[in-house]
Every structure is written in structure tokens, then in C-alpha cells.
UniProtKB/Swiss-Prot annotation:
Protein species of origin: Homo sapiens (Human)
Region (Disordered): 15-55
Taxonomic superkingdom: Eukaryota
Family assignment from sequence similarity: Belongs to the TAF12 family.
Subunit structure: Component of the TFIID basal transcription factor complex, composed of TATA-box-binding protein TBP, and a number of TBP-associated factors (TAFs), including TAF1, TAF2, TAF3, TAF4, TAF5, TAF6, TAF7, TAF8, TAF9, TAF10, TAF11, TAF12 and TAF13. Component of the TATA-binding protein-free TAF complex (TFTC), the PCAF histone acetylase complex and the STAGA transcription coactivator-HAT complex. Component of the PCAF complex, at least composed of TADA2L/ADA2, TADA3L/ADA3, TAF5L/PAF65-beta, SUPT3H, TAF6L, TAF9, TAF10, TAF12 and TRRAP.
PTM-bearing positions, type Phosphothreonine: 43, 59
Protein name in UniProt: Transcription initiation factor TFIID subunit 12
Alphabetized UniProt keyword annotations: Isopeptide bond, Nucleus, Phosphoprotein, Transcription, Transcription regulation, Ubl conjugation
Molecular functions per Gene Ontology: DNA binding; DNA-binding transcription factor binding; protein heterodimerization activity; TBP-class protein binding; transcription coactivator activity
Physiological role: The TFIID basal transcription factor complex plays a major role in the initiation of RNA polymerase II (Pol II)-dependent transcription. TFIID recognizes and binds promoters with or without a TATA box via its subunit TBP, a TATA-box-binding protein, and promotes assembly of the pre-initiation complex (PIC). The TFIID complex consists of TBP and TBP-associated factors (TAFs), including TAF1, TAF2, TAF3, TAF4, TAF5, TAF6, TAF7, TAF8, TAF9, TAF10, TAF11, TAF12 and TAF13.
Residue ranges of domain Histone-fold in the record: 59-126
Matches recorded under InterPro entries: Histone-fold, TAF12, TFIID_TAF12_dom
Compositional bias annotation for Polar residues: 26-36
Amino acid sequence: MNQFGPSALINLSNFSSIKPEPASTPPQGSMANSTAVVKIPGTPGAGGRLSPENNQVLTKKKLQDLVREVDPNEQLDEDVEEMLLQIADDFIESVVTAACQLARHRKSSTLEVKDVQLHLERQWNMWIPGFGSEEIRPYKKACTTEAHKQRMALIRKTTKK
């Protein structure tokens, strides 16, 4: 597999057991039910962008390498690169936020792979390579019995009259 394999863009091993760090004592009252603060390696700083030394998920160099792999003669404009990097950052942020909400819904203080996996499968129709979904099963339509078919035929026959 090439350098952009299953774990090149999103290293999900970082999400397997991230514990929330208490920011401070939560205030009493209406803010008591606020979302817990989770410290994730490589999250954006004050500027909102990840810096390369903070384990940025998608750097300009990686993006350029990916474009060259698709078409060696293609070159992206600076604005397009910035937009794609911003979209990638927004995607990561939305997935992590939703996964944190799922973990909170499970009444857990630990973000696990299954939280990220559930969100990606249900919202984005994406599967994480290497992680089975033994708990998440798609709904399978039950096969119809002969008795059911006869009842439905009788209903259709009576509604036509």
C-alpha cells in the first residue's frame, strides 16, 4: 500500500482511549451539563490551524503528494490548497465532536474507536479499515413467509372491490 494508506490521513489509534482533561471545575447551574473538554494530540491552537509540528493530519506537502499521485502534471493553486486543508480540518473536527457526543451518550469519559466508527458509518457511509463492526449491524429485512404473502394477497383483493 502507498503512503496514503488507511492510517495515513487519520490515525485512529490516537482515538482509541482519549481521556478528558478537566479544564476547570464546571460551574453550577445551566452550564453543568456542558460538553467535557477532551485534549486530543494535534488539535488546532489559537489560530485555528494545525501546525506541522503538532501532528497535522493533512499538510500541504501530503496534499501535493496526493495530487501528484493522481495526476503528475496537475498543480493546485494556493487558494485551493488552503480550502482543501480547511475542509479536512473541519471534517476531523466534526467527526471528533460527534464521536465525543456519542461517548458522552454512552455515559463514558473515554472516546473509543467505536464512537468514531459509528459516526463515520452512519453519517458519512465510511468504514474504518481494520476495525470490524461486530456491534454495528445493518438492518436486514426479514424474509416473508407464505402465510404473510397469502394475507397480503387477501388484503389487496379486498381493497380492489
